[in-house]
Amino acid sequence: MENKVTADYLDEEGCLHCGTCGKRKQMKVSLMGFEHVVSCLCECEVKARQELDEKMQREEAQRQLYQRKSVGLRERRFWEWKFENDNGSNQKILIARQYVENWTDMKRKNVGLLLMGPVGTGKSFFAGCIANALLEQGERVMMTNFSRILNEMTSYQADKNQIIQNLVDYPLLIIDDLGIERNSEFALEQVYNVIDSRYCKMLPLIVTTNLGLNEMKSTDLDTAHQRIYSRILEMCVPIYCGGEDKRKEEGTEKLVQVQSLITG
């Protein structure tokens, strides 16, 4: 049954009332010895204004979220990497969820993650889920890779120091696909500078890579690679995202480590 719309009406004092809620839309006030009729909000108008304010707040929140994602997630495919889109095939997603749930402690304790495993194991997806969840909470996150960073640094009139500073300013930096970037002396120096700058500022870092833990710890590496990987392993807890890990004992130990950090 449709609600009938009742016309506004005047009371015995000549003040207007809302025909729907019955509350005053006008009231009399005395000022400087004179009586004035002034407007006021009835319940319907208060409710309508509140709903409009809430709508505007939601729209502004969506606008700000879009802006944060546009800056922090340059590749549009990252936008769809969300926990609600997970197919449940890899239980390591629980670590990503716990990381987000305990983000305040993770940030305070400077806890990062090193998500490792072959192509197709979901490590980049897990990192993207963390990024999107924190962005939706209002946090500033940058998810990128060193190939993109190095391209920016070698572009015309690029300010390398400013680019590094911009990356350091993010509460969380996610580096996707570590190891695919070029291995020139310049490139390795800049990779180290970015990582070390966040280390010095005690800001968390999440890294995804196809490299194995043994590769990153190998003493056969040159000095440039050794110091990069050593710094990452200082900052990040290794999590193997593949199936059965050949380094099962070490993986279990690290899993306990990150869980203890997450739970306090």
Where are these regions (language model features)?
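A short, basic N-terminal segment
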Residues: 1-90, 251-264
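Metal- and O2-centered redox machinery and metal/ROS homeostasis
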Residues: 22-25, 93, 107, 241, ...
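Pre-Walker A (pre-P-loop) alpha-helix and adjacent loop at the N terminus of AAA/AAA+ ATPase modules
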Residues: 72-73, 79, 85-113
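Short glycine-rich substrate-engagement loop in P-loop NTPases that contacts/grips substrate
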Residues: 93-100, 132-172, 182-189
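Walker A/P-loop nucleotide-binding motif
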Residues: 108-127
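Residue-level preference for the first positions of well-ordered beta-strands
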Residues: 110-114, 140-141, 172, 204
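Walker B catalytic acidic pair
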Residues: 177-178
